[in-house]
Amino acid sequence: MANTSQARKRARQAGVRRVRNAGQRSMMRTYVKKIVKAIVSGDKSQAAAAYKEAVPILDRLARKGLVHPNKAARHKSRLNAQIRAMS
């Protein structure tokens, strides 16, 4: 339990940030799933469009520290390779 006013405030801020960050990470996962779904369905143009939409989101979350930059780069690289491999 927070004893000082500063600790109480930090606990409040941490709670707000935790909820916001969870929403942002969920959004990222939704974008990635949308790309994977398009890849599985075989629609290259839809997959490419979804990828183009998701890249700025991944970059922003990596820049803000919500996901590790290497994780964002790994997602982008693997998804792009799968899209390129489609005939």
Swiss-Prot record:
Report TM segments. none
Write out the GO cellular component annotations.
Answer: cytosol; small ribosomal subunit
Compositional bias, Basic residues, is annotated for 7-20
User: Listed GO molecular functions?
Assistant: small ribosomal subunit rRNA binding; structural constituent of ribosome
| A matching Pfam family | Ribosomal_S20p
UniProt KW keywords? Ribonucleoprotein, Ribosomal protein, RNA-binding, rRNA-binding
Please give the residue ranges the record annotates as the region Disordered: 1-22
What's one GO BP annotation on this UniProt entry?
A: translation
NCBIfam families to which the protein is assigned, alphabetical: S20
Family, per entry: Belongs to the bacterial ribosomal protein bS20 family.
Q: Which HAMAP family match?
A: Ribosomal_bS20 (MF_00500)
Q: What does this protein do?
A: Binds directly to 16S ribosomal RNA.
- Name the UniProt record assigns to this protein: Small ribosomal subunit protein bS20
Q: Which organism is it from?
A: Nitrosococcus oceani (strain ATCC 19707 / BCRC 17464 / JCM 30415 / NCIMB 11848 / C-107)
Source taxonomy = Bacteria, Pseudomonadati, Pseudomonadota, Gammaproteobacteria, Chromatiales
Name the gene behind this protein.
rpsT
